[in-house]
Regions:
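Short beta->alpha linker loops
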Residues: 10, 94-95
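DPxDG-like acidic metal-binding loop motif
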Residues: 59-90
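Phosphate-handling active-site elements
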Residues: 50-55, 84-94
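Catalytic-loop motifs flanking and including active-site residues across diverse enzymes
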Residues: 35, 74-75, 94
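N-terminal beta-alpha supersecondary unit
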Residues: 1-64
Length: 95
């Protein structure tokens, strides 16, 4: 199972990609209020680095709080936008 997981609930953005229950890629960066500019490009670049396409992801997990209301909304919107065309399951987690 391939999982894309990310957290947009604080100034520090975190992303992990799991393959067969092992983390194969991890990325973390202070983004503050720049999520709308960098979120999708970071996800795209991360998938390229592990030689995967979004359609190979089985589950997208996203932080649902507590944290920044706007950050959480952006993360959920991105996760939903990425998941819908490929019928990828969504999973929310608390941080």
């Amino acid at each position: 199972m391939n999982i894309l997981s990310f957290d947009t609930s604080s100034e520090k953005f975190s992303l992990a990609i799991y393959r067969k229950n092992q983390i194969i890629y991890y990325y973390s960066r202070i983004l503050k209020k720049k999520y709308s500019k960098y979120l999708i490009p970071i996800i795209k670049d991360s998938l390229i680095k592990v030689n995967m396409k979004i359609k190979q992801i089985n589950v997208i997990s996203i932080s649902v709080g507590p944290g920044s209301f706007t950050g959480i909304r952006l993360g959920i919107a991105a996760a939903k936008g990425l998941s819908m065309p490929y019928n990828i399951s969504l999973l929310g987690f608390s941080n």
